[in-house]
């Protein structure tokens, strides 16, 4: 009777359980049955239901990323569709939490993934961008997910500027995320050359007021101190510098090469860790370990195309990226960069033999050099053969006996005569040498007249 009394006191419905298991009626019934049998666990089940509801609400409010399709590339270049069941690359709760700041810079111009001015923030675990009006965090990335950070001069600007490119894991345009994991976006922002105007440490102290450190160097230092897996990479003259100087800033060297990917115009940067094509979405970064081969096609008098075959780290399938309309003036520098880093130059491979250099009758500077190099190699083989032949002749001359061929007047002898000579050598070499010596002396003294003197007169 006591059990029946307790059982009847259990409410027929508990709001938390109803909300948590509304989509699972069978599971909800089992929860109620368990509470009926052990009423003392009712509060525990209710707490579990509340926690389940909070998880469902967090997943439901997770942002759904749109599909980005690159029309001028293979199917692997499509960004994967992400849905509410996908596990985000970072927890939005952690990203937006009020953790202590280590650095922030106001009025920073972002270009990717959004074009607007935001506040750049670096916390103990995240790099993020905060809306300056609403104070909401717009986007960000965990610091330990960042694989590459680049600081590159912005091409074709009258005022010198630098683009910082943050490339998280699976955001390089080559490697796709695992199934069910959201593909993160690359992040690009711009800073002007000169001292920072609104940069602060985590405690609010303004940085760069002594004018000893430019804005780009300050941001680079902060990132290098904060990033656990990588460092900031900048262009290096020892890697590549364009043959054409910066058009809008006279006297300044250019580190970019203008190119097209399909109809999209952009810039190629050849760096110490890989090749970047930017700065519009989607950025593509070819780390050296993902480059399968690089070749040249459509080599014309003024332009050529660069083909990069990339292989994702966790896949054997390759993707091909073509960058067109590259100025011939940069052919030599690009080719030197490719050879320096041991990237496979497959332009002469069998599969590309129809698209070899000089396909349209034009010859680039490095192509001519390559042909000359091949000629040198070919010539060296001929020289080697000639040298071996000359060495053999030298050996024959060392073994040559001046008197042995006098009977033939230098015209050589038949094989039968050689056999006779061998037999005569066995019988008595000394006598033959004396006789031949006498004949040689007579010929020496009389010259051509020796032919007219009868033997008996001698």
Curated annotation (Swiss-Prot):
One of its GO terms (cellular component) is chromosome. It comes from the Eukaryota. It is found in: Nucleus; Chromosome. Residues 367-380, 390-408, 415-437, 446-458 have a biased composition (Acidic residues). Disulfide bonds: none annotated. Residues 71-95, 359-458 are annotated as: Disordered. The keyword Oxidoreductase does not apply. SMART domains: Rtt106 (SM01287). Residues 82-95 have a biased composition (Polar residues). One of its GO terms (molecular function) is nucleosome binding. Keywords: Chaperone, Chromosome, DNA-binding, Nucleus, Transcription, Transcription regulation. Its main location: nucleus. Interacts with histones H3 and H4. Histones H3 and H4 chaperone involved in the nucleosome formation and heterochromatin silencing. Required for the deposition of H3K56ac-carrying H3-H4 complex onto newly-replicated DNA. Plays a role in the transcriptional regulation of the cell-cycle dependent histone genes by creating a repressive structure at the core histone gene promoter. Belongs to the RTT106 family. This is Histone chaperone rtt106.
């Amino acid at each position: 009777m006591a059990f029946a009394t307790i059982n009847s006191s259990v409410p027929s419905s508990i709001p938390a359980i109803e909300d948590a298991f509304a989509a699972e009626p069978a599971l909800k019934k089992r929860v109620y049955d368990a509470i009926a049998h052990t009423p003392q666990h009712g509060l525990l089940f209710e707490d579990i239901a509340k926690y389940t509801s909070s998880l469902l609400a967090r997943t439901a409010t997770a942002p759904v990323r749109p599909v980005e399709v690159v029309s001028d590339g293979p199917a692997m270049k499509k960004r994967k569709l992400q849905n509410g069941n996908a596990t985000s690359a970072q927890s939005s709760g952690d990203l937006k939490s009020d953790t202590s700041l280590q650095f922030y810079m106001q009025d920073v111009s972002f270009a990717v993934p959004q074009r607007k001015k935001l506040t750049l923030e670096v916390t103990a675990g995240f790099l993020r961008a905060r809306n300056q009006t609403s104070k909401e965090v717009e986007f960000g990335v965990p610091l330990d997910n960042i694989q590459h950070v680049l600081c590159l001069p912005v091409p074709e600007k009258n005022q010198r500027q630098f683009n910082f490119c943050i490339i998280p894991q699976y955001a390089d345009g080559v490697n796709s995320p695992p199934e069910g994991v959201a593909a993160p976006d690359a992040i690009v922002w711009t800073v002007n050359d000169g001292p920072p105007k609104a940069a602060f440490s985590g405690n609010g102290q303004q940085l760069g007021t002594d004018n000893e450190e430019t804005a780009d160097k300050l941001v680079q230092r902060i990132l290098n101190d904060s990033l656990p897996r990588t460092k900031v990479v900048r262009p290096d003259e020892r890697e590549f510098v364009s043959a054409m100087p910066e058009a809008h800033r006279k006297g300044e060297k250019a580190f970019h090469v203008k190119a097209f990917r399909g109809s999209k115009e952009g810039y190629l940067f050849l760096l110490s860790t890989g090749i970047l094509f930017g700065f519009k979405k989607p950025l593509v970064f070819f780390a050296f370990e993902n480059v399968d081969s690089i070749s040249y096609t459509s080599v014309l008098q003024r332009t050529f195309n660069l083909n990069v075959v990339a292989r994702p780290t966790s896949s054997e399938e390759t993707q091909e990226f073509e960058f067109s309309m590259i100025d011939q003036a940069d052919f030599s520098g690009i080719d030197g960069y490719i050879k320096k880093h041991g990237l496979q130059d497959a332009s002469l491979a069998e599969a590309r033999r129809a698209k070899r250099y000089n396909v349209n009758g034009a010859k680039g500077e490095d192509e001519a050099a390559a042909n000359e190099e091949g000629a040198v190699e070919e010539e060296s083989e001929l020289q080697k053969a000639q040298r071996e032949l000359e060495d053999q002749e030298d050996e024959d001359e060392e073994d040559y006996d001046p008197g042995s061929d006098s009977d033939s007047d230098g015209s050589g002898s038949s094989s039968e005569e050689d056999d006779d000579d061998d037999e005569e050598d066995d019988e008595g070499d000394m006598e033959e040498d004396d006789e031949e010596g006498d004949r040689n002396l007579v010929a020496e003294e009389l010259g051509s007249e020796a032919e007219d003197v009868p033997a008996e007169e001698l």
